Design a protein with these regions (language model features):
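Long, low-complexity, charge-biased intrinsically disordered regions
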Residues: 1-281
Length: 281
């Protein structure tokens, strides 16, 4: 669901005045100003006031906010559970009881001007696949991969088979040293690419998390070797862009958390610090 003109729904905690809008100036009082009764687009308080208003309304309907993920709300009644996810003015509602979902939609429709976009299929660059017969749901960023590959002119590159070369030794001493190297790296979108890859890591591609983490350490002064490592990640993503996360039909397996960890003693060549890492899924 989408909230129409969401920022106009926020209440203001302070007095704010604005000049009369062009085309609507009072001819009898042209020097007077307008006092805002609600938030409008362009105010620095707009997004915050809208979020506060939505939070108040949805909690009034019985939803509880997740402490770890403030954009996630939950409402439970017996065995019926409803989840609501908010991203600015976009809303996803899910649950195991259709009438409960409809009641949430009806309530929100009374509070705000809403647009029902139907079953969620694509949100925040993530494609949602469903196989109801097998009780499977998949999350894919295929389109996002194509977008960043084209943006950084890697859409026709060779295909990679691993995100990072085995035993690749990246360190700060490999950063740009000479004026020529510095000028060369200024024209390389290193930080932008690393950030774009990080979004994929956060959403659907944990398989490139280690490579992204390693290359992100050299954003201040990257060198040619660092840039090559980043491009290798893009080549791997090009080859595996159709891979996606799948959540299956086995409740016991889905609710079980597996954790792995490892550590290395003084293995950072730059400062001889020890490193540790973990993954939970």
């Amino acid at each position: 669901m989408d909230v129409k003109t969401a920022f106009l729904n926020g209440y203001l905690d302070e007095d704010i005045y604005m000049v009369q809008p062009e085309g609507f100036v009072d001819p009898n009082h042209p020097r007077k100003v307008c006092k805002l009764q609600r938030s409008i687009y362009g105010l620095k308080q707009a997004s915050r006031s809208w979020n506060k208003r939505f939070d108040e309304e949805i909690k009034r309907f019985g939803f509880a906010q997740n402490l770890d993920e403030p954009c996630v709300y939950q409402k439970a009644s017996g065995s019926n559970v409803t989840f609501l996810i908010l991203y600015v003015d976009d809303i996803i509602i899910m649950g195991n009881h259709i009438p409960s979902l409809q009641s949430v939609k009806n309530y929100l429709g009374k509070c705000f001007s809403m647009k029902d976009l139907g079953e969620a299929a694509f949100i925040l660059g993530i494609k949602i696949y469903r196989d109801r017969s097998k009780q499977l749901i998949g999350l894919s960023q295929n389109a996002y991969m194509d977008k960043i590959l084209k943006r950084y002119k890697m859409d026709n590159s060779k295909r990679g088979y691993i995100p990072m070369q085995e035993r690749l030794d990246l360190n700060k001493s490999q950063g740009a040293q000479t004026p020529k190297e510095v000028n060369r790296m200024k024209n390389v979108p290193y930080a932008s690419v690393v950030g774009s890859i990080m979004y994929a890591v956060r959403c659907t591609r944990p398989d490139v998390a280690f490579a992204q983490n390693m290359t992100s350490r050299f954003q201040q002064n990257p060198g040619e070797l660092h840039w090559t490592a980043v491009k290798n990640i893009l080549k791997y993503l090009r080859n595996t862009k159709d891979m996606f996360l799948v959540y299956g039909e086995n409740p016991e397996a889905e609710l079980r958390v597996d954790c792995y960890c490892n550590a290395g003693f003084e293995i950072d060549i730059n400062d001889m610090k020890s490193l540790t890492g973990y993954v939970s899924f």
